Swiss-Prot record:
GO terms for biological process: L-proline biosynthetic process. Coiled coil: none annotated. The lineage of its organism: Bacteria, Pseudomonadati, Pseudomonadota, Gammaproteobacteria, Pasteurellales. It catalyses: L-glutamate + ATP = L-glutamyl 5-phosphate + ADP. This is Glutamate 5-kinase. Catalyzes the transfer of a phosphate group to glutamate to form L-glutamate 5-phosphate. Belongs to the glutamate 5-kinase family.
């Protein structure tokens, strides 16, 4: 039975539990839950904060000027400490992890988007848990995703997750500030993110983490518009991750917009104009339109234009009709060499391969 793919985002407050350093006992409990789900067949991806806090503690809380360079220094030192902490804890359960550091450029550039996605799927397919953070040591304002809430939503899209969990130091989203209003009630379900919901989330900001609620609402908006259910839940609740995975009602659930899933994917992948044309034979046309299959090199007759791996191209029939847009796994020069050939010949011809298909069905949109 195929279990769902879940992205779990841990904020610094969840990992430190209010202390100035990573809280190892709490991280151990987190790892125990994820190990249980991993062994039960769930595909888990971790998006982790905490590098700056780990770096500051490792350097014995140095007095540094409040500059971007200082933060990047702490992130550079702390990232290795953070990943080591995760690695040691997962090793107890004989589970391997793989680290990815991402910036916005890795997601917005189509070839890097494909590479990041392929790496994530390769890790998951080999039962390795990806641990992801924004590359704060080198990211500038222009290439930062912005925060790990937003990053986790983009990662959820990358891996086509069913669910995104945003774990925080709050119980979820309340209808007013519970510290100011004793009558404040937890909102268990949000059908749609409206201006009212945004105003609730942005209504207050404190060192307890409520100020970060707006970024979580923005992340939930991005994810749910891509068909990914999102839950804001308390990271310190016992067994919270496992309970969420097995459908217990905890925190605030944001309902996924299933009808928007395809349209958001069109916008995400195919906003740019096409860079070339791949002409296919009748067999490939039938496989794509009637059997919902990927495009194999054997079905390619001609390649027009110069394009890179991951750029958008048109798929055209022998009669001249454009039937699809898609992102090829190979650039135009490589496709010229492998067109009409069997997939088994790819590595012999090119000296490498990105897989047996020229264009995967997941990277293709059929034109009506």
């Amino acid at each position: 039975m195929n279990k769902k793919t879940i992205v779990v985002k841990f904020g610094t407050s969840t990992l430190t539990q209010g202390s100035p350093k990573l809280n190892s006992p709490h991280m151990m409990e987190i790892v125990r839950q994820i190990a249980q789900l991993h062994n039960d067949g769930f595909r888990i991806v971790i998006v982790t904060s905490g590098a700056i806090a780990a770096g500051r503690h490792y350097l014995n809380h140095p007095q540094l000027p409040p500059t971007i360079a200082s933060k990047q220094l702490l992130a550079a030192v702390g990232q290795s400490q953070l990943i080591q902490a995760w690695e040691k804890l997962f090793a107890i359960y004989d589970i391997h992890i793989g680290q990815l550091l991402l910036t916005r450029a890795d997601i917005e550039d189509r070839e890097r988007f494909l590479n990041a996605r392929d790496t994530l799927h390769a890790l998951l397919d080999n039962h390795i848990i990806p641990v992801i953070n924004e590359n704060d040591a080198v990211a500038t304002a222009e290439i930062k995703v912005g925060d790990n809430d937003n990053l986790s939503a983009l990662v959820a899209i990358l891996v086509q997750a069913e669910q995104l969990y945003l774990l925080t130091d709050q119980q979820g989203l309340f209808d007013s500030d519970p510290r100011k209003n004793s009558e404040a009630k937890l909102i268990p379900v949000v059908e749609q993110i409206t201006d009212h919901i945004r105003s609730i989330a942005g209504g207050s900001g404190t060192n307890l983490g409520t100020g970060g609620m707006m970024t979580k609402i923005i992340a939930a908006d991005v994810a749910t518009r891509s068909g990914i259910e999102t839950i804001i839940a308390p990271g310190n609740r016992p067994n919270v991750i496992a309970d969420l995975a097995y459908e217990q009602n905890i925190g605030t659930k944001f309902i996924a917009h299933q009808s928007d899933r395809l349209e958001s994917r069109k916008q995400w992948l195919f906003a740019a104009p096409s860079a070339g044309i791949i002409t296919i034979d009748n067999g490939a046309q039938n496989a794509i339109l009637e059997q919902n299959k990927s495009l194999l090199p054997a079905g390619i007759i001609n390649v027009e234009g110069r394009f890179s791996r991951g750029e958008v191209v048109k798929i055209r029939t022998q009669s001249g009709k454009d039937i699809a847009l898609g992102m090829p796994r190979y650039n135009s020069d490589s496709l010229q060499l492998i067109k009409g050939r069997k997939s088994a010949d790819i590595e012999n011809v090119l000296g490498y391969e990105y897989g047996a298909v020229a264009m995967h069905r997941d990277d293709m949109i059929i034109l009506s």
